[in-house]
Amino acid sequence: FNTFIVMRKISFVLAAIMAIALNCNAQSSNGCYRGFIDAGYSIGVGDYEFGRFEVNTSHGYQFNPYLFLGAGAGLHFMSSYETKDMDIPLDVRDSQVDIPVFANIRCNFSKKKVSPFVDVKGGTYVTNNGGLYVNASAGCRFAINEKQAVSLAVGYASEKLEFETFDRFTSNTSMNYTRSPRKLDTEAITLK
């Protein structure tokens, strides 16, 4: 159990370092292609307290210095999960990689070297029987030069993920049971 806590803390620190290093984008002031690569860590809140490392990329059109519209995909790496403090876990999920595809809109509030922004991604997972993916975040963009910037953001994600859920005991006289796949709503705070 202590190893799990240590690994979780190490994963969080590595994700934070990667987010700062990888959250770069190719930028131009208006009327052209723009691409983003962001890496970060999601901290599960609510009923499902799991964490995961994620990498997303978005590509689209920068209409003006303030508005970007595009589409993207990601890789979200989730370790195995079991409902805590139960002899027979209610919900379980094996370690897996979820792949979301999404539309992305991003609004910058300034043309200066340091600019606050909001970013919204909405789509679906194409792996593990699909499910809704929505992530809204707010942050600050720090321009490195005319074509590159580093961004830091905090956000909220709402996702519908598939878990194996306790279904029923197989008889009245044994502890054998069955599980059924079920999509459940999950929430997370994202750091990118």
Regions found by a protein language model. Give the residues of each.
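Extracellular loop and loop/strand-boundary signature of outer-membrane beta-barrel proteins
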Residues: 42-45, 87-92, 122-126, 139, ...
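Bacterial Sec-dependent N-terminal signal peptides
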Residues: 1-33
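Transmembrane beta-strands of outer-membrane beta-barrel proteins
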Residues: 34-40, 72-74, 117-121, 153-155
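Solvent-exposed loop/turn segments connecting transmembrane beta-strands
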Residues: 43-52, 95-97, 123-133
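Glycine- and aromatic-enriched membrane insertion/assembly motifs of diderm outer-membrane
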Residues: 47-112
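Outer-membrane beta-barrel "beta-signal"
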Residues: 102-105, 183-192
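Transmembrane beta-strands of outer-membrane beta-barrel pores
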Residues: 41-45, 75-79, 107-111, 122-128, ...
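Repeated loop/turn-to-beta-strand initiation elements of outer-membrane beta-barrel proteins
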Residues: 66-69, 112-116, 142, 146-150
